[in-house]
């Protein structure tokens, strides 16, 4: 819906075929719902470009269908701050759990001894986590004696 998917996103999941749809509410698309059901999972982590519609509508319907829904509030956006916040309120009142991108990232990492994903997680944290990212740099240089990072 609404054009091509960004190549940067497709590059992260090259084996996933996008589901073409015309509805604003992905949960009203049979192919989308079938793909979700095919995973066998009952927990959904979702975000969308348009909070009031493309996030709220499928979140509410997934909750109604018995899914546990986590909405990533800081990777979604509304047409205004108020519209975004009221939509998040509506989903939370219906049972959705609000989370941030960093909560999701670090919950997936869970343990710093997981070396397969450690470096990529640290790169994301350094680039996008503000003061926490700066703290990571500090710890690496001052505590661990790592070389200074170059821009």
Predicted region positions:
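Structural recognition of alpha->loop->beta junctions
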Residues: 10-20, 87-106
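Long, charged alpha-helical interface segments
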Residues: 100-105, 109-151
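Short Asp/Glu-rich motifs
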Residues: 3-5, 81-82, 110-111
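Short, hinge-like loop/turn segments at secondary-structure boundaries
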Residues: 8-14, 36, 64, 86-90, ...
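Active-site alpha/beta core segments
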Residues: 1-57, 122, 127
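Flexible, glycine-rich phosphate/dinucleotide-binding loops
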Residues: 1, 78, 107
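A contiguous pocket-lining binding segment that forms or flanks enzyme active sites
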Residues: 43-48, 52-101
């Amino acid at each position: 819906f609404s054009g091509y998917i960004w190549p940067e996103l497709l590059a992260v999941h090259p084996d996933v075929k996008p589901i073409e749809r015309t509805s604003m509410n992905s949960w009203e698309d049979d192919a989308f719902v079938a793909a979700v059901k095919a995973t066998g999972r009952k927990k959904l982590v979702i975000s969308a470009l348009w909070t009031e519609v493309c996030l709220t509508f499928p979140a509410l319907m997934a909750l109604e269908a018995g899914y546990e829904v986590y909405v990533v509030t800081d990777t979604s956006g509304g047409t205004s701050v108020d519209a975004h916040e009221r939509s998040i309120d509506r989903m939370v009142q219906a049972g959705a759990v609000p989370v941030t991108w960093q909560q999701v990232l670090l919950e997936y990492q869970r343990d710093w001894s997981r070396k397969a994903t450690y470096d990529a997680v640290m790169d994301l944290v350094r680039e996008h986590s503000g003061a926490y990212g700066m703290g990571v740099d500090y710890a690496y240089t001052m505590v661990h004696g790592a070389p200074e990072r170059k821009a």
